[in-house]
Amino acid sequence: MPTFTVCTNVCRDSMPDTLLSDLTKLLAKATGKPAEYIAIHIMPDQMMSFGDSTDPCAVCSLSSIGKIGGPQNKSYSKLLCDYLTKQMNIPANRVYINFHDLNPANVGWNGSTFA
């Protein structure tokens, strides 16, 4: 159930129409989790600054039950920053990604939890 959230000051109109689908496929492959469980939440047009500049930037989070940790996070960071740079023109040095390894008992879905 990986969830990837992106808050950005980039306007919606400049984002590719395939953004959600692309990120879903990218994360399904990277995490080894089924695409059916991947959730993507993009919040464009945010009032944001990074380093006292309002140039394009993003603050993101990737949450998952498992598949989060040291070497994996470095790999995800590279993959996601590369995508955001290529598709949204956000330089990698203007992106923060917070990683969260979730306890299955604390994640609800379909009227129950993953525990």
Curated annotation (Swiss-Prot):
It comes from the Eukaryota. The keyword Cell membrane does not apply. It catalyses: 3-phenylpyruvate = enol-phenylpyruvate; L-dopachrome = 5,6-dihydroxyindole-2-carboxylate. SUPFAM superfamilies: Tautomerase/MIF (SSF55331). Its main location: secreted. It is found in: Secreted; Cytoplasm. Its EC number is 5.3.2.1, 5.3.3.12. Substrate binds at residues 33, 65, 98. Belongs to the MIF family. The keyword Cytoplasm applies. The active site is at residue 2. Keywords: Cytokine, Cytoplasm, Immunity, Inflammatory response, Innate immunity, Isomerase, Secreted. Homotrimer. One of its GO terms (cellular component) is cytoplasm. It is an enzyme of class 5 (isomerase). GO terms for biological process: inflammatory response; innate immune response. GO terms for molecular function: cytokine activity; dopachrome isomerase activity; phenylpyruvate tautomerase activity. This is Macrophage migration inhibitory factor. Pro-inflammatory cytokine. Involved in the innate immune response to bacterial pathogens. The expression of MIF at sites of inflammation suggests a role as mediator in regulating the function of macrophages in host defense. Has phenylpyruvate tautomerase and dopachrome tautomerase activity (in vitro), but the physiological substrate is not known. It is not clear whether the tautomerase activity has any physiological relevance, and whether it is important for cytokine activity. It comes from Xenopus tropicalis.
